[in-house]
Amino acid sequence: MGKDEDEMRGEIEERLINEEYKIWKKNTPFLYDLVITHALEWPSLTVEWLPDREEPSGKDYSVQKMILGTHTSENEPNYLMLAQVQLPLEDAENDARHYDDDRSEFGGFGCANGKVQIIQQINHDGEVNRARYMPQNPFIIATKTVSAEVYVFDYSKHPSKPPLDGACNPDLRLRGHSTEGYGLSWSQFKQGHLLSGSDDSHICLWDINATPKNKALEAMQIFKVHEGVVEDVAWHLRHEYLFGSVGDDQYLHVWDLRTPSVTKPIQSVVAHQSEVNCLAFNPFNEWVVATGSTDKTVKLFDLRKISTALHTLDCHKEEVFQVGWNPKNETILASCCLGRRLMVWDLSRIDEEQTPEDAEDGPPELLFIHGGHTSKISDFSWNPCEDWVVASVAEDNILQIWQMAENIYHDEDDLPGDDAPKGP
Protein backbone atom coordinates (compact mmCIF):
# COMPACT_ATOMS: atom_id res chain seq x y z
CA MET A 1 0.00 0.00 0.00
CA GLY A 2 2.78 2.37 0.97
CA LYS A 3 4.17 2.54 -2.54
CA ASP A 4 0.75 3.31 -4.03
CA GLU A 5 0.23 6.09 -1.51
CA ASP A 6 3.67 7.52 -2.30
CA GLU A 7 2.97 7.32 -6.02
CA MET A 8 -0.37 9.06 -5.56
CA ARG A 9 1.24 11.76 -3.44
CA GLY A 10 3.89 12.23 -6.11
CA GLU A 11 1.28 12.49 -8.86
CA ILE A 12 -0.77 15.01 -6.89
CA GLU A 13 2.32 17.11 -6.20
CA GLU A 14 3.29 16.99 -9.87
CA ARG A 15 -0.20 18.09 -10.88
CA LEU A 16 -0.07 20.97 -8.41
CA ILE A 17 3.36 22.06 -9.68
CA ASN A 18 2.09 22.00 -13.28
CA GLU A 19 -1.00 23.96 -12.29
CA GLU A 20 1.13 26.57 -10.50
CA TYR A 21 3.40 26.81 -13.53
CA LYS A 22 0.44 27.43 -15.86
CA ILE A 23 -0.78 30.24 -13.59
CA TRP A 24 2.74 31.71 -13.49
CA LYS A 25 3.02 31.53 -17.28
CA LYS A 26 -0.32 33.28 -17.75
CA ASN A 27 0.73 36.12 -15.42
CA THR A 28 4.21 36.57 -16.91
CA PRO A 29 3.37 39.71 -18.96
CA PHE A 30 2.20 41.51 -15.80
CA LEU A 31 5.09 40.42 -13.58
CA TYR A 32 8.15 40.61 -15.84
CA ASP A 33 9.89 42.85 -18.35
CA LEU A 34 11.91 39.86 -19.59
CA VAL A 35 11.78 36.08 -19.35
CA ILE A 36 13.99 33.72 -21.34
CA THR A 37 13.60 30.00 -20.66
CA HIS A 38 16.24 27.64 -22.03
CA ALA A 39 16.40 23.87 -21.58
CA LEU A 40 19.98 22.69 -21.09
CA GLU A 41 20.98 19.18 -22.14
CA TRP A 42 21.86 18.38 -18.51
CA PRO A 43 21.08 20.20 -15.25
CA SER A 44 23.62 22.76 -14.07
CA LEU A 45 24.35 23.09 -10.35
CA THR A 46 26.04 26.45 -10.93
CA VAL A 47 25.52 29.70 -12.82
CA GLU A 48 27.45 32.98 -12.88
CA TRP A 49 27.35 35.91 -15.30
CA LEU A 50 30.70 37.02 -16.65
CA PRO A 51 31.31 40.79 -16.48
CA ASP A 52 31.78 41.51 -20.19
CA ARG A 53 29.04 42.92 -22.43
CA GLU A 54 29.07 43.75 -26.14
CA GLU A 55 26.57 45.62 -28.30
CA PRO A 56 26.81 44.44 -31.93
CA SER A 57 26.21 47.44 -34.20
CA GLY A 58 22.81 47.59 -35.85
CA LYS A 59 21.34 44.98 -33.49
CA ASP A 60 18.70 45.50 -30.81
CA TYR A 61 20.40 43.27 -28.28
CA SER A 62 23.59 42.99 -26.24
CA VAL A 63 25.72 39.86 -26.06
CA GLN A 64 26.85 38.58 -22.67
CA LYS A 65 28.41 35.40 -21.33
CA MET A 66 27.79 33.13 -18.36
CA ILE A 67 29.45 30.14 -16.71
CA LEU A 68 27.51 26.88 -16.39
CA GLY A 69 28.35 23.28 -15.54
CA THR A 70 26.82 19.86 -16.04
CA HIS A 71 25.49 17.21 -13.69
CA THR A 72 25.10 14.20 -15.98
CA SER A 73 24.19 10.57 -15.46
CA GLU A 74 26.95 8.11 -14.59
CA ASN A 75 28.44 7.26 -17.98
CA GLU A 76 28.04 10.65 -19.65
CA PRO A 77 30.93 13.16 -19.72
CA ASN A 78 30.70 16.32 -17.62
CA TYR A 79 31.72 19.80 -18.73
CA LEU A 80 32.50 23.25 -17.49
CA MET A 81 30.61 25.40 -20.01
CA LEU A 82 30.43 28.93 -21.30
CA ALA A 83 27.16 30.20 -22.71
CA GLN A 84 26.49 33.27 -24.80
CA VAL A 85 23.24 35.14 -24.18
CA GLN A 86 21.47 37.79 -26.26
CA LEU A 87 19.62 40.28 -24.06
CA PRO A 88 17.33 42.98 -25.46
CA LEU A 89 18.49 46.59 -25.30
CA GLU A 90 16.13 48.66 -23.22
CA ASP A 91 14.63 50.48 -26.23
CA ALA A 92 13.96 47.23 -28.03
CA GLU A 93 12.41 45.75 -24.94
CA ASN A 94 9.90 48.56 -24.66
CA ASP A 95 9.03 48.44 -28.36
CA ALA A 96 8.50 44.73 -28.64
CA ARG A 97 7.27 43.37 -25.35
CA HIS A 98 5.32 40.28 -26.15
CA TYR A 99 4.98 36.80 -24.78
CA ASP A 100 5.98 33.86 -26.95
CA ASP A 101 3.67 31.16 -25.67
CA ASP A 102 5.44 28.26 -27.34
CA ARG A 103 8.82 29.11 -25.90
CA SER A 104 7.73 30.50 -22.50
CA GLU A 105 9.51 33.73 -23.34
CA PHE A 106 8.51 37.28 -22.69
CA GLY A 107 10.17 40.41 -24.01
CA GLY A 108 10.96 38.93 -27.41
CA PHE A 109 13.08 41.06 -29.68
CA GLY A 110 13.50 39.39 -33.04
CA CYS A 111 16.78 37.47 -32.85
CA ALA A 112 17.07 34.96 -35.63
CA ASN A 113 18.98 32.43 -33.56
CA GLY A 114 18.41 31.17 -30.05
CA LYS A 115 19.05 33.65 -27.28
CA VAL A 116 21.18 31.17 -25.30
CA GLN A 117 24.00 29.28 -27.00
CA ILE A 118 26.67 27.03 -25.46
CA ILE A 119 29.92 28.32 -27.00
CA GLN A 120 32.53 26.29 -25.07
CA GLN A 121 32.67 22.92 -23.30
CA ILE A 122 35.69 21.95 -21.21
CA ASN A 123 36.04 18.35 -19.99
CA HIS A 124 35.50 18.05 -16.22
CA ASP A 125 35.90 15.05 -13.90
CA GLY A 126 32.44 14.53 -12.42
CA GLU A 127 29.78 17.19 -12.03
CA VAL A 128 30.67 20.83 -11.47
CA ASN A 129 29.44 21.59 -7.94
CA ARG A 130 30.23 25.29 -8.29
CA ALA A 131 32.17 27.49 -10.73
CA ARG A 132 33.31 31.08 -10.11
CA TYR A 133 35.50 33.44 -12.15
CA MET A 134 38.43 35.43 -10.79
CA PRO A 135 37.43 39.14 -10.66
CA GLN A 136 40.82 40.44 -11.86
CA ASN A 137 40.89 38.09 -14.87
CA PRO A 138 37.54 36.56 -15.84
CA PHE A 139 39.24 33.99 -18.13
CA ILE A 140 40.30 32.20 -14.92
CA ILE A 141 37.56 29.97 -13.48
CA ALA A 142 37.75 27.82 -10.34
CA THR A 143 35.50 24.79 -9.92
CA LYS A 144 34.45 22.66 -6.97
CA THR A 145 34.61 19.04 -8.07
CA VAL A 146 33.26 15.72 -6.81
CA SER A 147 36.78 14.90 -5.63
CA ALA A 148 38.67 16.74 -2.92
CA GLU A 149 40.54 18.89 -5.45
CA VAL A 150 39.56 22.34 -6.65
CA TYR A 151 40.29 22.88 -10.35
CA VAL A 152 41.39 26.11 -12.01
CA PHE A 153 40.88 26.63 -15.75
CA ASP A 154 41.99 29.45 -18.03
CA TYR A 155 39.25 29.04 -20.60
CA SER A 156 41.18 31.07 -23.21
CA LYS A 157 43.66 28.16 -23.35
CA HIS A 158 41.05 25.46 -24.05
CA PRO A 159 39.33 24.62 -27.35
CA SER A 160 35.63 25.40 -27.74
CA LYS A 161 34.86 21.71 -28.31
CA PRO A 162 36.36 19.24 -25.82
CA PRO A 163 38.91 16.59 -26.85
CA LEU A 164 37.13 13.33 -27.67
CA ASP A 165 39.26 11.29 -25.28
CA GLY A 166 37.35 12.95 -22.43
CA ALA A 167 40.54 13.84 -20.57
CA CYS A 168 40.13 16.60 -18.01
CA ASN A 169 43.13 18.94 -18.05
CA PRO A 170 42.74 21.76 -15.56
CA ASP A 171 45.49 24.38 -15.64
CA LEU A 172 45.87 23.91 -11.87
CA ARG A 173 44.75 21.37 -9.28
CA LEU A 174 44.41 22.84 -5.80
CA ARG A 175 44.97 20.42 -2.91
CA GLY A 176 44.22 20.59 0.80
CA HIS A 177 40.73 19.14 1.20
CA SER A 178 39.92 15.48 1.80
CA THR A 179 36.32 15.58 0.47
CA GLU A 180 34.12 17.52 -1.93
CA GLY A 181 32.06 20.62 -1.12
CA TYR A 182 30.45 23.78 -2.48
CA GLY A 183 32.01 26.86 -0.84
CA LEU A 184 34.17 28.91 -3.23
CA SER A 185 35.19 32.59 -3.21
CA TRP A 186 37.84 34.69 -5.00
CA SER A 187 39.32 37.75 -3.31
CA GLN A 188 38.45 41.04 -5.00
CA PHE A 189 41.57 42.61 -3.49
CA LYS A 190 44.33 40.02 -3.84
CA GLN A 191 44.55 38.57 -7.32
CA GLY A 192 44.68 34.78 -7.23
CA HIS A 193 43.65 34.33 -3.59
CA LEU A 194 40.95 31.67 -3.47
CA LEU A 195 38.94 30.34 -0.51
CA SER A 196 37.18 26.99 -0.44
CA GLY A 197 34.98 25.24 2.13
CA SER A 198 34.22 21.51 2.02
CA ASP A 199 32.47 18.62 3.73
CA ASP A 200 35.74 17.80 5.59
CA SER A 201 35.02 20.77 7.95
CA HIS A 202 38.08 22.67 6.65
CA ILE A 203 38.55 25.99 4.86
CA CYS A 204 41.48 26.16 2.45
CA LEU A 205 43.21 29.27 1.12
CA TRP A 206 45.41 29.20 -1.99
CA ASP A 207 47.42 31.78 -3.87
CA ILE A 208 47.33 30.56 -7.46
CA ASN A 209 50.30 32.82 -8.28
CA ALA A 210 52.55 30.45 -6.29
CA THR A 211 54.77 28.04 -8.23
CA PRO A 212 52.95 24.75 -8.84
CA LYS A 213 54.49 21.27 -8.89
CA ASN A 214 53.15 19.24 -11.82
CA LYS A 215 50.24 21.68 -12.15
CA ALA A 216 49.28 21.15 -8.49
CA LEU A 217 49.32 23.56 -5.54
CA GLU A 218 48.99 22.83 -1.83
CA ALA A 219 46.89 25.15 0.34
CA MET A 220 48.69 28.18 1.75
CA GLN A 221 46.57 28.00 4.94
CA ILE A 222 43.92 25.62 6.29
CA PHE A 223 41.41 26.98 8.82
CA LYS A 224 39.84 24.51 11.25
CA VAL A 225 37.08 25.46 13.65
CA HIS A 226 33.80 24.21 12.15
CA GLU A 227 32.47 20.94 13.52
CA GLY A 228 30.96 19.38 10.43
CA VAL A 229 30.46 20.44 6.82
CA VAL A 230 31.59 23.94 5.81
CA GLU A 231 28.73 24.88 3.49
CA ASP A 232 29.94 28.25 2.22
CA VAL A 233 32.77 30.79 2.39
CA ALA A 234 32.90 34.42 1.26
CA TRP A 235 35.47 37.18 1.22
CA HIS A 236 34.42 40.50 2.69
CA LEU A 237 33.92 42.99 -0.14
CA ARG A 238 35.36 46.07 1.61
CA HIS A 239 38.13 44.70 3.87
CA GLU A 240 40.77 42.59 2.16
CA TYR A 241 41.80 40.56 5.23
CA LEU A 242 38.30 39.50 6.32
CA PHE A 243 36.24 36.51 5.23
CA GLY A 244 33.26 34.58 6.56
CA SER A 245 32.30 30.93 6.76
CA VAL A 246 29.12 29.03 7.66
CA GLY A 247 28.43 25.37 8.28
CA ASP A 248 26.29 22.52 9.49
CA ASP A 249 27.31 23.33 13.08
CA GLN A 250 24.94 26.36 12.80
CA TYR A 251 27.82 28.83 13.15
CA LEU A 252 28.75 31.96 11.26
CA HIS A 253 32.46 32.70 11.75
CA VAL A 254 34.30 35.85 10.69
CA TRP A 255 38.04 35.48 10.13
CA ASP A 256 40.88 38.02 9.89
CA LEU A 257 44.03 36.94 8.04
CA ARG A 258 46.08 39.38 10.12
CA THR A 259 45.60 37.20 13.20
CA PRO A 260 48.04 34.27 13.16
CA SER A 261 45.66 31.57 14.42
CA VAL A 262 43.94 29.27 11.92
CA THR A 263 41.65 27.93 14.65
CA LYS A 264 40.38 31.20 16.14
CA PRO A 265 37.98 33.37 14.14
CA ILE A 266 37.63 36.99 15.34
CA GLN A 267 33.84 36.68 15.64
CA SER A 268 31.46 33.75 15.98
CA VAL A 269 27.74 33.35 16.45
CA VAL A 270 25.25 30.48 16.40
CA ALA A 271 23.40 32.05 13.48
CA HIS A 272 20.48 29.65 12.99
CA GLN A 273 18.61 26.77 14.60
CA SER A 274 19.78 24.40 11.88
CA GLU A 275 22.54 24.06 9.26
CA VAL A 276 23.71 27.36 7.73
CA ASN A 277 24.00 26.82 3.98
CA CYS A 278 25.10 30.16 2.54
CA LEU A 279 26.32 33.67 3.30
CA ALA A 280 26.83 36.93 1.40
CA PHE A 281 28.46 40.19 2.49
CA ASN A 282 26.69 43.36 1.40
CA PRO A 283 28.69 45.06 -1.39
CA PHE A 284 27.81 48.58 -0.14
CA ASN A 285 27.45 48.35 3.64
CA GLU A 286 30.63 46.99 5.24
CA TRP A 287 28.83 45.81 8.39
CA VAL A 288 25.99 43.73 6.94
CA VAL A 289 26.08 40.02 6.12
CA ALA A 290 23.18 37.75 5.12
CA THR A 291 22.92 34.03 5.89
CA GLY A 292 20.48 31.33 4.76
CA SER A 293 19.62 28.12 6.56
CA THR A 294 17.90 24.76 6.63
CA ASP A 295 15.63 26.35 9.28
CA LYS A 296 13.92 28.07 6.27
CA THR A 297 15.03 31.58 7.25
CA VAL A 298 17.38 34.24 5.92
CA LYS A 299 19.04 36.35 8.62
CA LEU A 300 20.85 39.67 8.53
CA PHE A 301 23.73 40.34 10.93
CA ASP A 302 25.62 43.52 11.83
CA LEU A 303 29.32 42.71 12.31
CA ARG A 304 29.52 45.39 15.03
CA LYS A 305 26.96 43.49 17.13
CA ILE A 306 26.95 40.00 15.76
CA SER A 307 25.46 38.26 18.81
CA THR A 308 21.86 38.91 17.72
CA ALA A 309 20.42 39.04 14.22
CA LEU A 310 19.38 42.44 12.87
CA HIS A 311 16.37 40.93 11.13
CA THR A 312 14.93 37.58 10.06
CA LEU A 313 13.25 36.96 6.70
CA ASP A 314 11.03 33.94 7.11
CA CYS A 315 8.73 33.48 4.11
CA HIS A 316 10.49 30.48 2.59
CA LYS A 317 8.62 27.20 3.04
CA GLU A 318 11.74 25.06 2.57
CA GLU A 319 15.43 25.20 3.47
CA VAL A 320 17.36 28.15 2.02
CA PHE A 321 20.38 27.25 -0.11
CA GLN A 322 21.59 30.49 -1.67
CA VAL A 323 21.60 34.22 -0.92
CA GLY A 324 22.91 37.03 -3.13
CA TRP A 325 22.89 40.83 -3.01
CA ASN A 326 21.91 42.92 -6.02
CA PRO A 327 25.26 44.38 -7.21
CA LYS A 328 23.74 47.82 -7.85
CA ASN A 329 21.21 48.25 -5.02
CA GLU A 330 22.31 48.18 -1.39
CA THR A 331 18.98 47.05 0.07
CA ILE A 332 18.02 44.36 -2.48
CA LEU A 333 18.71 40.72 -1.57
CA ALA A 334 17.63 37.50 -3.28
CA SER A 335 17.36 34.03 -1.76
CA CYS A 336 16.28 30.64 -3.06
CA CYS A 337 15.09 27.50 -1.37
CA LEU A 338 14.31 23.85 -1.93
CA GLY A 339 10.71 24.86 -2.66
CA ARG A 340 11.25 26.05 -6.28
CA ARG A 341 10.92 29.71 -5.34
CA LEU A 342 13.40 32.57 -5.58
CA MET A 343 12.47 35.52 -3.37
CA VAL A 344 13.66 39.10 -3.82
CA TRP A 345 13.66 41.31 -0.73
CA ASP A 346 13.85 45.10 -0.36
CA LEU A 347 15.24 45.69 3.12
CA SER A 348 14.42 49.40 2.96
CA ARG A 349 10.75 48.38 3.30
CA ILE A 350 11.16 46.54 6.61
CA ASP A 351 8.47 47.67 9.10
CA GLU A 352 6.54 49.67 6.50
CA GLU A 353 2.83 49.85 7.22
CA GLN A 354 0.65 47.37 5.36
CA THR A 355 -3.03 46.78 4.83
CA PRO A 356 -4.27 43.43 6.18
CA GLU A 357 -4.81 42.38 2.54
CA ASP A 358 -1.18 43.13 1.62
CA ALA A 359 0.05 41.39 4.76
CA GLU A 360 -1.50 38.15 3.50
CA ASP A 361 0.98 38.19 0.59
CA GLY A 362 3.95 38.47 2.94
CA PRO A 363 5.87 41.11 4.91
CA PRO A 364 6.48 44.55 3.32
CA GLU A 365 10.12 43.71 2.54
CA LEU A 366 9.13 40.75 0.31
CA LEU A 367 9.33 42.50 -3.05
CA PHE A 368 8.92 39.64 -5.53
CA ILE A 369 8.63 35.87 -5.83
CA HIS A 370 10.02 34.26 -8.97
CA GLY A 371 7.82 31.22 -9.54
CA GLY A 372 9.03 30.10 -12.97
CA HIS A 373 10.87 26.94 -11.90
CA THR A 374 9.14 23.60 -11.44
CA SER A 375 12.11 21.99 -9.70
CA LYS A 376 14.63 22.89 -7.00
CA ILE A 377 16.73 25.97 -7.88
CA SER A 378 20.43 25.06 -7.64
CA ASP A 379 22.02 28.50 -8.10
CA PHE A 380 21.31 32.04 -9.28
CA SER A 381 23.34 35.06 -10.35
CA TRP A 382 22.57 38.79 -10.56
CA ASN A 383 23.69 40.29 -13.87
CA PRO A 384 26.47 42.85 -13.20
CA CYS A 385 25.74 44.83 -16.41
CA GLU A 386 21.93 44.87 -16.59
CA ASP A 387 19.95 46.18 -13.65
CA TRP A 388 17.56 43.68 -12.06
CA VAL A 389 18.35 40.82 -14.49
CA VAL A 390 18.82 37.43 -12.81
CA ALA A 391 19.86 34.02 -14.18
CA SER A 392 18.69 30.94 -12.28
CA VAL A 393 19.21 27.21 -12.89
CA ALA A 394 17.13 24.32 -11.59
CA GLU A 395 17.45 20.55 -11.25
CA ASP A 396 15.12 19.95 -14.22
CA ASN A 397 17.73 21.30 -16.73
CA ILE A 398 16.03 24.71 -16.98
CA LEU A 399 18.00 27.95 -17.18
CA GLN A 400 15.87 31.08 -16.80
CA ILE A 401 16.96 34.66 -17.40
CA TRP A 402 14.45 37.13 -16.06
CA GLN A 403 13.79 40.69 -14.98
CA MET A 404 10.84 41.66 -12.83
CA ALA A 405 8.55 44.41 -14.13
CA GLU A 406 9.84 47.90 -13.41
CA ASN A 407 6.64 48.99 -11.67
CA ILE A 408 7.29 46.40 -8.93
CA TYR A 409 10.55 47.90 -7.69
CA HIS A 410 10.16 51.57 -8.64
CA ASP A 411 9.63 53.75 -5.58
CA GLU A 412 7.35 56.17 -7.42
CA ASP A 413 4.82 53.36 -7.50
CA ASP A 414 4.86 53.03 -3.73
CA LEU A 415 1.83 55.26 -3.53
CA PRO A 416 -1.42 54.74 -1.64
CA GLY A 417 -3.52 52.29 -3.56
CA ASP A 418 -0.54 50.68 -5.27
CA ASP A 419 -0.81 46.92 -5.18
CA ALA A 420 1.81 45.76 -7.62
CA PRO A 421 1.73 41.95 -7.59
CA LYS A 422 4.60 40.10 -5.92
CA GLY A 423 4.31 37.02 -8.06
CA PRO A 424 2.66 33.65 -7.60
Swiss-Prot record:
Keywords: Chaperone, Chromatin regulator, DNA damage, DNA repair, DNA replication, Nucleus, Repeat, WD repeat. Its main location: nucleus. Transmembrane segments: none annotated. GO terms for biological process: chromatin remodeling; DNA repair; DNA replication; regulation of DNA-templated transcription. The keyword Chaperone applies. Gene3D superfamilies: YVTN repeat-like/Quinoprotein amine dehydrogenase. It is found in: Nucleus. One of its GO terms (molecular function) is histone binding. WD repeats lie at residues 123-163, 176-216, 225-265, 271-311, 315-355, 372-412. One of its GO terms (cellular component) is nucleus. Disulfide bonds: none annotated. Belongs to the WD repeat RBAP46/RBAP48/MSI1 family. This is Histone-binding protein MSI1. It comes from Solanum lycopersicum. The gene is MSI1.
